[in-house]
Amino acid sequence: MRDRHEIELMKRVVVGRGTRRELPKVIKALGFDGGEVLVVTGPHVWSEWGDELQGLLEKEGFKVDFVTVVEPSVEEANKVLEGLNGEPNVVVGFGGGKAIDVAKYVAMKLGRDVVSVPTATSHDGIASPFSSLKGLKGPTSVKTKTPIAVVADIEVIARAPERLNRAGIGDVLAKFSAVRDWRLAHVLKGEYYGSYAASLALMSAKHVLKYSPLLKALSEDGLRILVEALISSGVAMCIAGSSRPASGSEHLFSHALDVIANRPALHGEQVGVGTIMMLYLHGSKLWRKVRKVLRDLNLPTTAEELGVEDEKIIEALTIAHKIRPERYTILGSDGLTREAAERLARTTGVIK
């Protein structure tokens, strides 16, 4: 058991059609009445929705300073900080995972609260207290700020590229292997394990499995289910105080691919494929079910569908344990041999 466990949770979650119009009201309800709002966004998102959002905020007396980011990196975040025109009262992350991850990091550096306004369901960073940024020393993610609120507009999300929205499905299903890794680390290494946070993360994954038919067409009902599952996953991380309930060996595999692949796929696509293989290593029959659901929902289940060479899959499996050596998973401390990695990828159908 930990000597001390601190939980920081968001104060408000608003999900529905047209909820972007409620953003000024939500910000005011959280105690920010007027002043400057820093909006961190992406160029495509801002070109489509920026004028409307700026108008909504200015109408309610807020001064808006917006900045666009093109990649989730410490360098990009530092550019935002260096280019500030004033001292914002609150930061808004308005976009996909890149913009929101940078916004959370910037908010942490400024000592300000951050409101998450996701425009796609690409991964569970929309509600988590962690940011995955390039240029970090050590782990690929850093504890930043838990969003004080999440405002998810299904109308906006439905207009995101289908591939981006589908990617979040893979990130939610990854909880099946992540929680198993966490439990394994608890049993073998004495690491803290929070059963409540683990149960919440698993519930998100089970929810997506149960309602997968609604997700196939990415209907508004399906998108709402996916958004709520991603938010629940973020809450699980808040409760755990770490990314453990949401990120395990499947994420290490994905991060390894990011390092070595010539053209990595989307994060959620890669962890989905990783989940298939890691569940097999855990001896869980669930790997076949996850593979079937990913196939049914038009998500990659093979190296070819990821657009990654077979050799890169094998290499990623052999180096994944080195990405975060302090995070014990089914890959063990020594990782997989090349022979074991190739056998795993072939057995699960990831490579031919």
Swiss-Prot record:
Chain positions recorded as NAD(+) binding sites: G97, K98, A99, I100, D101, T119, A120, T121, S122, S128
Binding-site residues, Zn(2+): D171, H251, H267
Alphabetical UniProt keywords: Cytoplasm, Lipid biosynthesis, Lipid metabolism, Metal-binding, NAD, NADP, Oxidoreductase, Phospholipid biosynthesis, Phospholipid metabolism, Zinc
UniProt cross-references to Gene3D superfamilies, sorted A to Z: 3.40.50.1970, Dehydroquinate synthase-like - alpha domain
Enzyme Commission number, as recorded: 1.1.1.261
Cofactor binding note from Swiss-Prot or TrEMBL: Binds 1 zinc ion per subunit.
Highest taxon of the lineage: Archaea
Subunit structure: Homodimer.
Function of the molecule: Catalyzes the NAD(P)H-dependent reduction of dihydroxyacetonephosphate (DHAP or glycerone phosphate) to glycerol 1-phosphate (G1P). The G1P thus generated is used as the glycerophosphate backbone of phospholipids in the cellular membranes of Archaea.
Family the UniProt entry places it in: Belongs to the glycerol-1-phosphate dehydrogenase family.
Protein name listed in UniProt: Glycerol-1-phosphate dehydrogenase [NAD(P)+]
